């Protein structure tokens, strides 16, 4: 998630490790992955002189604001977030301990806190995140109505490629959480990449969403 200020032109980029613990995980592996993510982002060109790169869990205000936002969000709104349904089904299919955490259900509220805590004006996301941003705007509007104008209404800024589809299932977004065969890693071996691309399910027509 990025936010920028016209005055300072500094981008805030966070590694969202709190979101990562909403599904079953190994603590040691999470720590290693978090550190590796920071290294990878810097290697990909993030400039520390122009960006603030930080780990989400090291800023406790994210959780504090998320709790306030939880109390401004209805159960019905969260049930309409399609990604919760999708991820829950994925975990069931993969047999991941048969445990669906409440954190997975409420993580869109934490996502709203991630955005609004920095009073972001624009949020660059894929098209699949539009419903989450709509929820974020609703939460900001309720907060402002109750406590006074404070949060700006963040605007959607779609990325150039709205959604990259899975190499194994053309109806799903590419995601490592679906399994190794569904995604191509940034530093994956060339032979493995070629194998996945060669086996990828393709179609001569439009994708399910015409993308």
Please give the residue ranges for each predicted region.
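Active-site cores that bind ATP or allylic diphosphates and position pyrophosphate for catalysis
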Residues: 85-211
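A glycine-rich helix N-cap at a beta->alpha junction
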Residues: 33-53
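Short, glycine/charge-rich beta-strand/loop segments that flank catalytic centers
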Residues: 49-63, 82-92
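Active-site flanking residues adjacent to catalytic metal/cofactor-binding acidic residues
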Residues: 1, 14-16, 113, 127
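Glycine-rich loop at the start of a catalytic domain that most often binds anionic cofactors/ligands
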Residues: 21-39, 64-72
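Short, conserved active-site loops that position catalytic residues or coordinate cofactors/metal ions
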Residues: 12-24
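Acidic, His- and aromatic-enriched active-site or binding-groove loops in soluble protein domains
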Residues: 73-84
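Single conserved hydrophobic/aromatic residue that forms the stacking wall/gate
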Residues: 1-7, 11
């Amino acid at each position: 998630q990025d936010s920028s200020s016209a005055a300072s032109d500094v981008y805030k980029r966070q590694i969202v490790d709190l979101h990562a613990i909403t599904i079953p995980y190994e603590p040691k592996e999470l720590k290693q992955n978090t550190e590796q993510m920071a290294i990878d982002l810097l290697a990909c060109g993030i400039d520390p002189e122009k960006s603030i790169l930080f780990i989400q869990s090291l800023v406790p205000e994210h959780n504090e604001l998320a709790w306030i936002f939880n109390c401004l969000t209805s159960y019905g709104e969260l049930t309409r977030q399609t990604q919760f349904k999708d991820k829950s089904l994925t975990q069931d299919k993969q047999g991941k301990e048969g445990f669906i955490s409440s954190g997975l259900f409420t993580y869109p509220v934490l996502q709203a806190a991630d955005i609004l805590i920095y009073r972001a004006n624009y949020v660059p996301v894929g098209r699949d995140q539009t419903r989450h941003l709509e929820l974020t705007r609703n939460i900001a509007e309720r907060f402002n109505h109750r406590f006074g104008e404070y949060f700006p209404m963040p605007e959607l800024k779609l990325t150039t490629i709205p959604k990259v589809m899975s190499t194994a299932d053309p109806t799903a977004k590419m995601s490592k959480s679906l399994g190794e065969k569904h995604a191509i890693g940034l530093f994956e071996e060339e032979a493995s990449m070629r194998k996945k691309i060669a086996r990828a399910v393709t179609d001569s027509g439009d994708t399910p969403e015409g993308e």
